[in-house]
């Protein structure tokens, strides 16, 4: 039984890696390995995994709906929750980036430097397509839609959230991105556990990435990377705004209640 549980959690990750690695390898052969098209290859290879991940997520979701029923919630409530989830993820992402940049980790991590060069090697619109549309859908379906849910079935939502966050961090390989992805993943897991909507994690993930792209392209928040009073103060304010947004999100749920993990 335990082996079956482990397999149920990890085989979607293996499938994700096999498909994305195969497509990325094929694109390397066809298009070459220049930084200018790295995000294009990332978008295509991640996009190739979405049909399979969606099918697995939908299968789990249908079983759950048969057991617990389908809960209908008004569109207005969803819009409010989406705004709050995006605010929480966006501000928390800004603060995380700032606090990590204030440490020596960014300078000493060669893996992060390489990943950063690849990420920002192409045009802004390709960065937006890959990291704000395709990748958030694929990664949230996998980690918050499938892994979290499957672990939660036998270990509870707290353990499911921790596992999904840690595994999400591990796929980013280098230490800097592991810390950022694991902590942001934990927040996204809380959003899914509280709201029962994976789509809100997708929106939050996309928002955090979009802000990262915007601030890098514009340089508008460069001061907040520095361990100065202004940089630290701004980052603390971002955390505070994120916490208020999360509390407001929970408050909207207390009015209506929610069911089991759903869409």
Question: Language-model segments: which ranges?
Answer:
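Hydrophobic core of alpha-helical transmembrane segments in multi-pass integral membrane proteins
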Residues: 17-25, 48-55, 86-95, 233-254
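Membrane-interface helix/loop boundary segments of multi-pass membrane proteins
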Residues: 138-163, 190-197
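Alpha-helical transmembrane segments in multi-pass membrane proteins
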Residues: 12-62
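Small-polar-interrupted transmembrane alpha-helices in polytopic inner-membrane proteins
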Residues: 157-172, 206
